[in-house]
Curated annotation (Swiss-Prot):
Tissues expressed in: Expressed in nurse cells and oocytes.
Subunit-structure text: Component of the core survival motor neuron (SMN) complex composed of Smn, Gem2, Gem3, rig/Gem5 and one of 3 almost identical Gem4 paralogs encoded by Glos/Gem4a, Gem4b or Gem4c. Part of a minimal SMN complex composed of Smn and Gem2 only; this complex is active in UsnRNP assembly. The SMN complex associates with the entire set of spliceosomal snRNP Sm proteins, SmB, SmD1, SmD2, SmD3, SmE, SmF and SmG, and with the snRNP-specific proteins snRNP-U1-70K, U2A, snf/U1A and U5-116KD.
Name of the protein this chain belongs to: Gem-associated protein 2
Main location: cytoplasm
Pfam families: SIP1 (PF04938)
Gene Ontology CC terms, in alphabetical order: cytoplasmic U snRNP body; nucleus; SmD-containing SMN-Sm protein complex; SMN complex; SMN-Gemin2 complex; spliceosomal complex
Length: 245
């Protein structure tokens, strides 16, 4: 049997996304789902086939803390800050396309003896993780080192940073946090455990609270919150949040 070219097997996706051309800048952070997919194409060719066995878990400093439960948020004060149905559909398509790429890549790496339990990029120290996430893009060469358990714990850390009491979070300016949240959700294995849904719901409530603080004309600042809320409802089926989108 004749094997398909390697590049062709990686085209299984929900959207038609072009591979990076000569104008592609890998140092420029992605600003949309489509650009994130292009970065995935680029990163795919740089992922190692085999990595070493990890020596420790991330859980050490994260498993002993719990998320602060937020009250049920109020409905948005300005309807103009809500996403349109067309916008929501486009974001879901881009997200599902990214997930499809991750699934294909994981299968290919498994066929090449890729060890997903490889050493994580940092220690179990949450502050070092935060520093790393602030200064590095969420590349596949990093995220594919993490097991499902590690991804869940990373999502929990991100959700805590989203409601940091010592800073004023604005996902339009704190782009690093928005990108890591999106990329971690892309890489999560399904189905999810109940405690992961609890983390997702915490993130959704926080996004609603932050969006409710915006003024009527701050539509652009609402976009990152709308994206995470849309994914929570339309991808992860937390339908009781649908009134907020």
């Amino acid at each position: 049997m004749q094997h398909e070219p390697e590049d062709q097997t990686f085209q299984l996706q929900a959207l038609e996304i072009c591979e990076p051309d000569s104008s592609f800048d890998p140092q420029k952070p992605p600003e949309s789902g489509e650009e994130y997919l292009m970065h995935m194409f680029y990163e795919r060719k740089r992922c190692p086939a085999v990595v070493t066995k990890r020596s420790s878990k991330i859980r050490n400093n994260t498993g002993n803390t719990t998320l602060e439960m937020l009250d049920n948020p109020e409905l948005p004060p300005f309807k103009c800050l809500l996403p349109t149905p067309e916008w929501r559909d486009e974001q879901v398509k881009s997200f599902q396309a990214a997930r499809s790429q991750v699934l294909v890549l994981r299968k290919e790496l498994a066929n090449n003896n890729y060890d997903q339990s490889g050493e994580p990029p940092l220690t179990s120290d949450q502050e070092k993780w935060k520093e790393f996430c602030r200064n590095q893009q969420p590349l596949l060469s990093t995220l594919l080192h993490l097991t499902q358990n590690d991804l869940e714990l990373l999502l929990e850390m991100l959700s805590k940073w989203l409601q940091d009491p010592n800073t004023t979070v604005d996902l339009l300016h704190d782009v690093w946090l928005a990108r890591w949240l999106y990329a971690t959700l892309v890489c999560l294995h399904l189905p999810l455990e109940p405690h992961v849904f609890s983390t997702l719901r915490y993130i959704a409530r926080t996004c609603i609270h932050l969006r409710n603080q915006l003024k009527e004309d701050e539509v652009q600042r609402a976009a990152p919150y709308n994206l995470l809320l849309t994914l929570t409802v339309q991808v992860f089926a937390q339908n009781d949040f649908k009134d907020y989108i």
